Design a protein with these regions (language model features):
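Nucleotide-activated sugar donor-binding and catalytic core shared by glycosyltransferases
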Residues: 1-386
């Protein structure tokens, strides 16, 4: 059996790696091909191309990358045609994934087509849910409220759970990490998480670093740790090397988890990482900044109250969101001071909210990758009967 997986960014790479492990547990002879990052490659898949090429985001920033992306779509479709897998599973990155699925349909390549991680139609285009059945045979979602948007439109959809509940961060032991970098017990670790895309780092890291400089003056015992990924490591390293505050840049997943388990606070780009921080009770804020034209378009096209997943899932403002003009040194500094104060209302609100979030996500109860693997194998079996 050959499973063809396509993950276009680091979060999808981690999700894909967990799915691969779960599939191998159920069928040790299973083979993999496709597109992914270092985590999926560790599980035995040789990526067709470097996913760094797809690490783009933002309506205005995408245009220069269009020729490269179109070339990769053609390469992917040709590879699927040649390898003849039992299933093609795209993971997140719907913009790229949709084009691959449409091209496979157009070329009439007979293969089961699935997508893992529903596009956020409730935030963007609800009409998109009405047409997805034309391009994929089955959809796997992370949140329990999502199937209702797709099932009425002829698309078999299954809620499998969010991968954050399986995160190794939950059981990480920081001891080895602290010893390796000789971080003394009297130091308080604070995480700086500017995102995994080049444009995110360019937009967020400068203001995060400005805040860190001021924060260090107020709290000399703070020790800053900046987890990043290899796709943006050089840019991050260049940006922090001249700063007065000592900032430890780390790139491995294990060290990121260990650092988070010992952190007293964090500032983060909105995304899955913020959900992980909430799961392990790290006080944090989310901040995001994009070019003005992108921000204008997003505000016109979206219909949501929050950008942070914790706030969206609980439907109330638990985690502070500092967006666009609010993403400045002064507001970051003021909010972080509250995060570092266990007696502040913000600190108490977050801790109570995080407890409720764990219940909503089924932490300790659900195993999303196992459920996803079961559905994939069942879908292949059903498809082969046709």
């Amino acid at each position: 059996m050959l499973v063809y997986l396509i993950a276009g960014e680091p979060s999808g790479d981690m999700l894909g790696a967990r799915l691969m492990r779960a599939l191998k547990e159920k069928n040790p002879k299973i083979k993999f091909a496709g597109v992914g990052g270092e985590n999926m490659e560790k599980e035995g898949m040789k990526s067709l191309f470097d996913i760094t090429d797809l690490a783009i985001m933002g309506l205005a920033e995408v245009i220069p990358s269009i020729p490269k992306v179109l070339r990769h779509i053609r390469e992917t479709v040709d590879d699927v045609k040649e390898k003849k897998p039992d299933v093609v599973i795209t993971i997140d990155s719907w913009s790229f994934s949709a084009r691959v699925h449409k091209a496979l349909r157009k070329k009439k390549i007979k293969v089961l087509q699935m997508h893992y991680v529903a596009p956020q139609v409730w935030a963007w285009k609800k009409r998109r849910a009405k047409t997805m059945y034309k391009y994929i045979d089955r959809l796997l979602t992370l949140f329990p409220n999502e199937p209702q948007y797709f099932i009425p439109h002829h698309l078999p959809t299954d809620f499998v759970g969010h991968p954050v509940v399986e995160s190794s961060m939950i059981n990480a032991d920081p001891k080895e990490f602290l010893e390796k970098y000789q971080i003394s017990p009297d130091k308080k670790i604070m995480l700086i998480l500017p995102g995994s895309r080049h444009n995110e780092v360019a937009n967020l890291l400068p203001v995060f670093l400005e805040m860190a400089e001021e924060l260090k003056k107020l709290y000399p015992d703070l020790f800053f740790v900046l987890p990043t990924v290899k796709t943006v490591k050089q840019r991050v390293t260049d940006m922090v090397k001249d700063k007065q505050s000592d900032i430890l840049v780390i790139t491995t997943q294990a060290e990121r988890y260990a650092a988070a388990k010992s952190a007293v606070a964090a500032v983060a780009a909105s995304g899955t990482v913020a959900l992980e921080l909430a799961i392990v009770n790290v006080p944090h804020l989310v901040a995001y900044k994009v070019p003005p034209i992108t921000a204008w378009l997003v505000r016109r096209l979206t219909h949501i109250k929050y950008v942070n997943l914790t706030n969206l899932l609980l439907d109330r403002p638990i985690v502070p969101e500092l967006l666009q003009e609010d993403c400045n040194k002064e507001k970051l500094l003021a909010t972080t001071k509250d995060l570092l104060n266990s007696k502040s209302e913000l600190y108490k609100t977050e801790q109570k909210g995080f407890e409720n979030l764990r219940k909503v996500l089924g932490v300790g109860v659900m195993r999303p990758s196992q459920k996803a693997a079961e559905i994939v194998l069942e879908a292949i079996k059903e498809y082969n009967k046709k």
